[in-house]
């Protein structure tokens, strides 16, 4: 399959630069997987679409202020984007500089350049950085870091983004991008869903900067997926198996929840799904056999991205591309701060190719 098969025209004006004032008031495009039928509504329509006993699976990762600015002690300006925290002193990061720093390079970080760090090793495209500071890494990032808004939002981060670019249920710091489908859930909607009898479970996948990297090959089968850390604990496994046993649906909130659950299913030796704690490089594209997910809540993704490929594998290529064409025509808002989709599984998707 060609990467260009997953391209579509998107006017710049449809890229959302700010979220809706009220999280759950975004628009919702519903796609019926088996038929391709589309319906238009608002996000709170989920209350009518979900049944008592259905299981929503959320990703409870929390975005860290992962973008740092500063300079090398020798003078050149740098921008650091944390990929992951290795421990209380070290990070793995992307570094933008006119000349890549060598091991041993001293870095001065923060607006006042008061934080001292050393680039200690290089791992492919990533740099290992150790802070020379008594505080834990997370405290340093909270003090001097900027929220790592995606490039397409195309504005400096603001103080408000520290909360707006987090889900209301975020709990475990470690992501450099929000699991954006979850941004639409507010406390009143969560309470209403619970009252209806909708079950909830929480996985953790720390979204890495690789999620924004373009696919740089022509044929998608040649793409090497970036690695991200995921946790699917026993209580999530139990909730999934219980929902399946009683004939209810498992609904993933966002592609990161999909990738977590499907990673746990792939690694399972005897049951449908088993606990999973580790790095995943799962790459889902048309032809993939979904094992766990019955429905998906997700935002609108970038052209030619691995995420639109994941959606195509779930809903079917033609249904997905038609939905995106309709969304553009109907002026839905796209990407991280944009509108959402509710998609049910298309069993024919596995045999469909572009």
Curated annotation (Swiss-Prot):
- What biological process terms from GO does the record include? queuosine biosynthetic process; tRNA wobble guanine modification
Sample GO molecular function, one term? S-adenosylmethionine:tRNA ribosyltransferase-isomerase activity
Cell location? Cytoplasm
* GO CC annotations on file: cytoplasm
Pfam families noted in UniProt: Queuosine_synth
Q: Give the metabolic or biological pathway.
A: tRNA modification; tRNA-queuosine biosynthesis
Could you list this entry's UniProt keywords, alphabetically sorted.
Cytoplasm, Queuosine biosynthesis, S-adenosyl-L-methionine, Transferase
Q: What is its EC number?
A: 2.4.99.17
Q: Record's InterPro entries?
A: QueA, QueA_dom1, QueA_dom2, QueA_sf
Provide the reaction this enzyme catalyses.
7-aminomethyl-7-carbaguanosine(34) in tRNA + S-adenosyl-L-methionine = epoxyqueuosine(34) in tRNA + adenine + L-methionine + 2 H(+)
* Top-level division of the source organism's lineage: Bacteria
Share what the entry says about its subunit structure, partners included: Monomer.
The record ties this protein, via HAMAP family, to: QueA
Q: What the protein does?
A: Transfers and isomerizes the ribose moiety from AdoMet to the 7-aminomethyl group of 7-deazaguanine (preQ1-tRNA) to give epoxyqueuosine (oQ-tRNA).
Q: Which family does it belong to?
A: Belongs to the QueA family.
Q: State the protein's name.
A: S-adenosylmethionine:tRNA ribosyltransferase-isomerase
Q: Which gene is this protein's source?
A: queA
């Amino acid at each position: 399959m060609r990467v260009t098969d997953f391209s579509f025209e998107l006017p710049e004006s449809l890229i959302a630069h700010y979220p809706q004032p009220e999280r759950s008031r975004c628009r919702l495009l519903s796609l019926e997987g088996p038929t391709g039928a589309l319906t238009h509504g608002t996000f709170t329509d989920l209350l009518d679409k979900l049944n008592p006993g259905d299981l929503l699976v959320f990703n409870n990762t929390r975005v860290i202020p992962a973008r740092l600015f500063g300079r090398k002690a020798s003078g050149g300006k740098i921008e650091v984007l944390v990929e992951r925290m290795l421990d209380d002193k070290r990070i793995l990061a992307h570094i933008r500089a006119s000349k890549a720093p060598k091991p041993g390079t001293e870095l001065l970080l923060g607006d006042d350049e008061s934080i001292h760090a050393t680039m200690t090793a290089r791992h492919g495209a990533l740099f290992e950085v150790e802070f020379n500071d008594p505080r834990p890494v997370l405290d340093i990032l909270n003090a001097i870091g900027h929220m790592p808004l995606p490039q397409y939002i195309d504005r400096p981060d603001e103080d408000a983004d520290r909360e707006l670019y987090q889900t209301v249920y975020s709990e475990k710091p470690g992501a450099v991008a929000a699991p954006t489908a979850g941004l639409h859930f507010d406390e009143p909607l969560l309470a209403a869903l619970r009252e209806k009898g909708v079950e909830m479970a929480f996985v953790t996948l720390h979204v890495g900067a690789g999620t924004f990297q373009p696919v740089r090959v022509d044929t998608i089968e040649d793409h090497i997926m970036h690695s991200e850390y995921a946790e699917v604990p026993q209580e999530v496994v139990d909730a999934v198996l219980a929902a399946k046993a009683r004939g209810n649906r498992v609904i993933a909130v966002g592609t990161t929840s999909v990738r977590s659950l499907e990673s746990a299913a792939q690694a399972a030796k005897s049951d449908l799904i088993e606990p999973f704690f580790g790095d995943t490089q799962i790459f889902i594209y048309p032809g993939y056999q979904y094992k766990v997910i019955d429905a998906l809540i997700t935002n609108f993704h970038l052209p030619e991205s691995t995420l639109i490929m994941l959606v195509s594998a779930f809903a079917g290529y033609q249904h997905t591309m038609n939905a995106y064409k309709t969304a553009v025509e109907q002026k839905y808002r796209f990407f991280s701060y944009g509108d959402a989709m509710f998609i049910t599984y298309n069993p024919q998707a596995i045999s469909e190719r572009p």
